[in-house]
């Protein structure tokens, strides 16, 4: 039997790259005919992911990385004020280099005695411009969406609305009825790019989805039954493969800036806490707060009386990753550290999120509602309180709280950089609510965690979906069997 090569083009950010590599590992584990080539687009901004990709390359001989050369003409950093437009232009600037690399791969496979064929190009949300390369080289293209089925429904709906009436979204506009999402969606929870006056780039991305051979989504049928059922009955939508949860169970590798001593300090402190007694606060790789908001969070935690583990990070210049706080006493209320740190709570910088959510002492999660974080919390049965920041997190928070009933609603429409300060009393209520021992939300989350684990096992819905994707790529229809 002939072997096949799948070429993945992920976005360089951790939230996109890590699940892409985990899915690649899942594919090679399932079928020994598959090898994976990752075209590594370098991040415009400094990251800590190089050691993670090196560890994958060293441990997985059928996954290799090819670095895409940096283009000479890159979009200016000021454009990062509109991330969707910035990333789209940055990725588009890579197209000539990517085309050259893939052309060489196709040529090499055609001349190789090993009978390895380039079977498909798998692109990220921000890399849909690479679909043109696949078309030119007559290679099927697939989209790997690191977000969820509800977000996919939203993106598929955007071009339809735009064709009827040029979109100019205001937060005060009427709610939208979106096929695949149960409740009408208020524009205030739309992805930030659509409500900041710069939505054309977002619509351009969404308009390419239907050009692919199929769409792989990091979700599972049991979690998003409504949306996935709709996709399966709409002939105008490419086949959808719900393959999740695709999560990294060893997230320490992905963030080498977390030193072992800090990890050990965190886990040792958790080991000393009662079961399900700690609320974990973490807001993603780009989540941070100004000093006045930090003080309110601290006061809310103290008022709640709950034990807490707080990953506290401070804003950095635009386009760079938030940094750990160098002087906690400057941003926290007077005496807060003396009263709480190491006793009722622990404040840290970057934290091993998966390991913390898996710990028996963790009972709740105050989260930015990034999709990877949501999947990790469901996997470990830890309920979330919503505090979205950016990207599609507001939509995620809305659906988790209002549609799925698996999160407690604190804020749904908060946006990073907002002048709005969430007060201590509101934070106190949210923390106390998420830590309630016998809440309906906790019961639902724990039950969905069990379903998530079944979904990825042999006989599960996502296991079957991965098999269907493999068959569609290398089976009879693609001519590589």
UniProtKB/Swiss-Prot annotation:
The gene is UGT71K2. It is an enzyme of class 2 (transferase). Belongs to the UDP-glycosyltransferase family. InterPro entries: UDP-glycosyltransf_plant (IPR050481), UDP_glucos_trans (IPR002213), UDP_glycos_trans_CS (IPR035595). CDD domains: GT1_Gtf-like. UDP-alpha-D-glucose binds at residues 285, 350-351, 368-376, 390-393. Keywords: Glycosyltransferase, Transferase. Coiled coil: none annotated. Signal peptide: none annotated. SUPFAM superfamilies: UDP-Glycosyltransferase/glycogen phosphorylase (SSF53756). Optimum temperature is 25 degrees Celsius. Glycosyltransferase that possesses chalcone and flavonol 2'-O-glycosyltransferase activity. Converts phloretin to phlorizin (phloretin 2'-O-glucoside), a potent antioxidant. Possesses glycosyltransferase activity toward quercetin, isoliquiritigenin, butein and caffeic acid. It comes from Pyrus communis (Pear). This is UDP-glycosyltransferase 71K2. Pfam families: UDPGT (PF00201). GO terms for molecular function: UDP-glucosyltransferase activity. Its EC number is 2.4.1.-.
């Amino acid at each position: 039997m002939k072997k096949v090569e799948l070429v993945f083009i992920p976005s360089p950010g951790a939230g996109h790259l890590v699940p892409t590599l985990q899915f690649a590992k899942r594919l090679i584990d399932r079928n020994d005919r598959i090898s994976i080539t990752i075209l590594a687009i370098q991040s415009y901004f400094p990251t800590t992911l190089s050691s993670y990709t090196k560890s994958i390359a060293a441990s997985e001989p059928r996954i290799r990385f090819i670095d895409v050369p940096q283009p000479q003409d890159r979009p200016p950093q000021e454009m990062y004020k509109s991330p969707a437009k910035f990333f789209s232009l940055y990725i588009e600037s890579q197209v000539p280099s990517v085309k050259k690399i893939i052309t060489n791969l196709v040529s090499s496979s055609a001349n190789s005695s090993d009978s390895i064929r380039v079977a498909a190009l798998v692109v990220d949300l921000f890399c849909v411009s690479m679909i043109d390369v696949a078309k030119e080289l007559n290679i099927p293209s697939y989209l790997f969406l690191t977000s969820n089925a509800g977000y996919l429904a939203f993106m598929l709906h955007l071009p339809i609305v735009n064709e009827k009436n040029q979109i100019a979204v205001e937060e005060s506009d009427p709610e939208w009825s979106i096929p695949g999402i149960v409740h009408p969606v208020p524009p205030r929870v739309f992805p930030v790019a659509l409500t900041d006056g710069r939505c054309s780039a977002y619509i351009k991305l969404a308009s390419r989805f239907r050009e692919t051979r199929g769409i792989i989504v990091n979700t599972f049928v049991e979690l998003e039954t409504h949306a996935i059922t709709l996709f399966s009955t709409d002939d105008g939508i490419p086949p959808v493969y719900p393959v999740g949860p695709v999560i990294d169970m060893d997230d320490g590798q992905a963030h080498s800036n977390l030193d072992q001593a800090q990890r050990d300090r965190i886990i040792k402190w958790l080991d000393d806490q009662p079961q399900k007694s700690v609320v974990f606060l973490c807001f993603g790789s780009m989540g941070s707060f100004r000093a006045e908001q930090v003080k309110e969070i601290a006061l809310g935690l103290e008022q709640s009386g709950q034990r807490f583990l707080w990953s506290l990070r401070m804003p950095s210049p635009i386009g760079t990753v938030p940094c750990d706080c160098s002087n906690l006493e400057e941003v926290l209320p007077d005496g807060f550290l003396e009263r709480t740190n190491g006793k009722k709570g622990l404040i840290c910088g970057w934290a091993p999120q998966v390991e913390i959510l898996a710990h028996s002492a963790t009972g709740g999660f105050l989260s930015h509602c990034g999709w990877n974080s949501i999947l990790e919390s469901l996997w470990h049965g830890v309920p979330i309180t919503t505090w979205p920041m950016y990207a599609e997190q507001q939509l995620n928070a809305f659906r988790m709280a209002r549609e799925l009933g698996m999160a407690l609603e604190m804020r749904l429409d908060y946006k990073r950089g907002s002048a709005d300060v969430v007060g201590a009393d509101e934070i106190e209520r949210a923390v106390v609510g998420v830590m309630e021992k016998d809440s309906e939300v906790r019961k639902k989350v724990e039950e969905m965690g069990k379903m998530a684990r079944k979904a990825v096992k042999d006989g599960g819905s996502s296991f079957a979906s991965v098999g269907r994707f493999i068959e569609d790529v290398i089976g009879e229809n693609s001519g590589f069997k």
